[in-house]
Swiss-Prot record:
Presence of keyword Endoplasmic reticulum: no
EC number(s) from the headed UniProt entry: 1.2.4.1
Assembly information from the UniProt record: Heterodimer of an alpha and a beta chain.
Name of the protein in its database record: Pyruvate dehydrogenase E1 component subunit alpha
GO molecular function: glycosylation-dependent protein binding; pyruvate dehydrogenase (acetyl-transferring) activity
GO terms (BP aspect): branched-chain amino acid catabolic process
Superkingdom classification of source: Bacteria
Gene: pdhA
Xref: NCBIfam families: PDH_E1_alph_x
Catalytic reaction equation(s): N(6)-[(R)-lipoyl]-L-lysyl-[protein] + pyruvate + H(+) = N(6)-[(R)-S(8)-acetyldihydrolipoyl]-L-lysyl-[protein] + CO2
Cofactor(s) needed for function: thiamine diphosphate
Amino acid sequence: MAILIKNKVPTTLYQVYDNEGKLIDPNHKITLTDEQLKHAYYLMNLSRMMDKKMLVWQRAGKMLNFAPNLGEEALQVGMGLGLNENDWVCPTFRSGALMLYRGVKPEQLLLYWNGNEKGSQIDAKYKTLPINITIGAQYSHAAGLGYMLHYKKQPNVAVTMIGDGGTAEGEFYEAMNIASIHKWNTVFCINNNQFAISTRTKLESAVSDLSVKAIACGIPRVRVDGNDLIASYEAMQDAANYARGGNGPVLIEFFSYRQGPHTTSDDPSIYRTKQEEEEGMKSDPVKRLRNFLFDRSILNQAQEEEMFSKIEQEIQAAYEKMVLDTPVSVDEVFDYNYQELTPELVEQKQIAKKYFKD
């Protein structure tokens, strides 16, 4: 519990390295291996390059509407690094990089955002729930999973995240409160990218430090530079170890900047200036980690170029798999979700089959 705070209002973000990739504290011990750092950089670039391809495909009518992860790659991959493989993840609609870290294949994310139900059929071995669109519901899911882990005395945690705007939802407080009362194994996260669609944080909340919302529930919290991979990893590891130890839940606020649109149906140029975007890009998470890796000779130009080539091939292969995959039938949708159908579900299934047949 080295970096968690109980009641004092934090005034600064927890950071490990600056925009140039230099350690803020030269004596800070990096516990991640070079291979872990390079793998993290690979996944961050996979997420970003895939998002950029998807934006092009969507504009060309080859994909449906989706929510890019641009600007949140470090905090999401950092979250993954701080978890164990038997911990649970309850994603929201902007959790693609975290899901890639957990092992979910790129083609599965493409299937989801192209309206194919197979995109939600995630292999149970990844312990990652399907993408949740309903804002706030994932907090209840994570609280419930934390209850299960606590009840079974399993040394694992359930992790979820929500946007800054989502902290105004009732389920945000309700889930944290009940998890705190019963000391469930849950880590709640806020991905504060400073915009709820077009609404700025100052118009969403009377406090700019969203982590203080944990005080009402009596749980510890930490506010982290979400553009810093290592700080994000250390915060998640610290929080997860605290929660898995039977101490109850934790709240982490990751502070970042949403570089792209809320979704592809949104145009951010309407509500923010180019100058503002350029300022936000100065702390770009991918560039910051690149600076860190190059500065410490963990990665070089040739290795990076080889990495990018591999990523391009992986994305293209995923797209081709998505295109060739067939939509699931109504029977498959119901049979995948329910072991046994109630009379009401049987009726709904018949209505759905008739509707889609027509």
